[in-house]
């Protein structure tokens, strides 16, 4: 059973979709080697650690502004263009 419970975590991020996105993105960062913001002495799985981080208020989310979305899209487009150029 996941501790903390989903209901406890939903008190911090009240939208299930945002919660899943936030936890999964943080879990991927933990898998990639980032240090946890909460104690992980028992070597729990990354999703459990990320869930505890959200429940403790160490991790949260925010929606991007329109300007930030445009910047991210432009950056992504530039990366794709560079990747295509390197493959040719």
From Swiss-Prot:
**What reaction is this protein's catalytic activity?**
RNA(n) + a ribonucleoside 5'-triphosphate = RNA(n+1) + diphosphate
Q: Name one GO molecular function term.
A: DNA binding
GO biological process terms, semicolon-separated? DNA-templated transcription
Q: What InterPro entries does UniProt report for this protein, alphabetically?
A: DNA-dir_RNA_pol_omega (IPR003716), Pol_omega/Rpo6/RPB6 (IPR006110), RPB6/omega-like_sf (IPR036161)
Q: Which GO terms describe its cellular component?
A: DNA-directed RNA polymerase complex
Q: Which UniProt keywords apply?
A: DNA-directed RNA polymerase, Nucleotidyltransferase, Transcription, Transferase
For this protein, the record's Gene3D superfamilies field holds: 3.90.940.10
Q: What is its EC number?
A: 2.7.7.6
The protein's job, in short, is: Promotes RNA polymerase assembly. Latches the N- and C-terminal regions of the beta' subunit thereby facilitating its interaction with the beta and alpha subunits.
Subunit arrangement? The RNAP catalytic core consists of 2 alpha, 1 beta, 1 beta' and 1 omega subunit. When a sigma factor is associated with the core the holoenzyme is formed, which can initiate transcription.
Which NCBIfam families has this protein been placed in? rpoZ
Q: Which PANTHER family match?
A: DNA-DIRECTED RNA POLYMERASE SUBUNIT OMEGA
The family this protein is said to belong to: Belongs to the RNA polymerase subunit omega family.
Q: What is this protein called?
A: DNA-directed RNA polymerase subunit omega
């Amino acid at each position: 059973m996941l501790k903390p419970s989903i209901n406890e975590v939903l008190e911090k991020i009240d939208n299930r979709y945002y919660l899943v996105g936030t936890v999964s993105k943080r879990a991927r960062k933990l898998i990639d080697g980032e240090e946890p913001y909460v104690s992980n002495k028992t070597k729990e799985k990354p999703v459990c650690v990320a869930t505890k981080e959200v429940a403790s208020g160490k991790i949260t989310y925010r929606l991007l502004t329109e300007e930030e979305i445009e910047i991210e899209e432009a950056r992504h487009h530039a990366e794709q263009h560079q990747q295509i150029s390197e493959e040719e």
